[in-house]
Amino acid sequence: WASQVSENRPVCKAIIQGKQFEGLVDTGADVSIIALNQWPKNWPKQKAVTGLVGIGTASEVYQSTEILHCLGPDNQESTVQPMITSIPLNLWGRDLLQQWGAEITMPAPLYSPTSQKIMTKMGYIPGKGLGKNEDGIKIPVEAKINQKREGIGYPF
């Protein structure tokens, strides 16, 4: 599962105890929270010992009495003991995201800012190909080391 930051919220599905839930990926949440209206009535819950901070005023906060089996969006095995309260959508917190191997990456640009300015002045449009009809290569050519130990490309 992957999601680019955009106007759309990063939402993914998880299966908890065989039941599918959809939730918002929330790296700012310490724990995962299931919306009270989505919590199955036959699943046990108890009043939470601690409150929730950062989601506004939650009057009733519960927690699952059991540690539950969970499958992440790409079938990652995990366990969770979620909090339960009246929120509009489920939140997948760091307790699950860490078990799923979630990462936040910000790729470095392929070219330096100086080379980008030079290319732009020469008429290059990002995302378009090189050449008169903008149909040429769109990604840089990678240098390959010559493993035969002869000719161009052989590291001395």
UniProtKB/Swiss-Prot annotation:
GO BP: proteolysis; viral translational frameshifting
Post-translational changes noted in the entry: Autoproteolytically processed at the N-terminus. Expected C-terminal autoprocessing not detected. The sequence shown is that of the processed Pro protein.
UniProt cross-references to Pfam families, sorted A to Z: G-patch, RVP
Disulfide bonds: none
Active site (record annotation): 26
Function, as annotated: Retroviral proteases have roles in the processing of the primary translation products and the maturation of the viral particle. Endogenous Pro proteins may have kept, lost or modified their original function during evolution.
Anything else known: Insertional polymorphism. Provirus present in 29% of tested individuals.
The protein, known as: Endogenous retrovirus group K member 113 Pro protein
